[in-house]
């Protein structure tokens, strides 16, 4: 079926990667000396291949940490930030009748577990700073709460997500699953939604983000987590049922 709105798959061509840089006022502070080299390594690998958008409070500090790189491929935007999870607080790219749009949903720290007053404004600030191409149309999607890691698209009208996350307390608990489904189908131009009904992970602050459980690898392939350790608490938990749902309930995936 043709769609006016298309939510691209993970493998769709992109113009840049966005990173939100760790600093001493984030939760990474106690292990910042370990985290910064990791982000530097990620940044350098991205810069070798495409443009990199870095959101940070202090551009000078990040330049010192990066050292010698091709800065022609780096776009800096200075602003206050709470944390580093750009996949969750960042804008979600769609095409509406071919026009690129950037959806800006509410990000509230995974159901108000953590401070997100700055991160919730990042996409809006980036648009005000004219960071994106002039053809990109920003769209305010408030008051709906949605993190990028909570949805997965095959780019062909199918979206995968979890029941546990989208309707959780302090997100969109005022909506029934049927209402959530209608809304998501409308704004993302979907034919169907694959709801994972399991997905417990010990220590997970996201309430079962689908990107920690199952991912589309192609239009007909889903990769999912699986626990093989019989001593692990996940071996007989709901998490083990994720694979069964992926294998038995949905087509045309393998």
Question: What is each model feature region?
Answer:
Residues 253-254:
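Intrinsic-disorder-associated, low-complexity terminal segments enriched in Asp/Asn/His/Tyr and depleted
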Residues 1-247:
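The feature marks the mature, well-folded catalytic cores of soluble enzymes
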């Amino acid at each position: 079926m043709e769609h006016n709105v298309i939510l691209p798959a993970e493998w769709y061509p992109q113009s840049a990667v966005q990173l939100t840089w760790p600093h001493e006022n984030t939760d990474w502070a106690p292990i910042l000396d370990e985290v910064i080299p990791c982000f530097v390594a990620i940044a350098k690998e991205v810069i070798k291949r495409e443009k990199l958008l870095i959101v940070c409070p202090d551009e000078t500090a990040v330049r010192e940490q990066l050292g010698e790189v091709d800065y022609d491929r780096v776009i800096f935007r200075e602003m206050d930030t709470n944390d580093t999870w750009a996949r969750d607080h960042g804008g979600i790219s769609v095409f509406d009748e071919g026009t690129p749009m950037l959806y800006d949903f509410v990000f509230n720290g995974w159901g108000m577990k953590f401070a997100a007053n700055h991160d919730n404004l990042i996409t809006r600030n980036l648009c005000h700073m004219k960071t994106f191409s002039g053809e990109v149309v920003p769209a305010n999607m408030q008051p709906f709460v949605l993190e990028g890691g909570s949805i997965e698209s095959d780019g062909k009208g199918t979206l995968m997500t979890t029941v546990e996350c989208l309707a959780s307390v302090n997100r969109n608990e005022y909506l029934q699953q049927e209402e959530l489904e209608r809304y998501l189908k409308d704004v993302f131009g979907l034919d169907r939604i694959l709801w994972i009904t399991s997905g417990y992970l010990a220590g997970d602050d996201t309430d079962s983000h689908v990107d920690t459980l199952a991912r589309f690898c192609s239009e007909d392939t889903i990769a999912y987590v699986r626990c093989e350790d019989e001593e692990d608490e996940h071996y007989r938990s709901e998490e083990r049922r994720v694979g069964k749902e992926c294998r038995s309930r949905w087509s045309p995936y393998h």
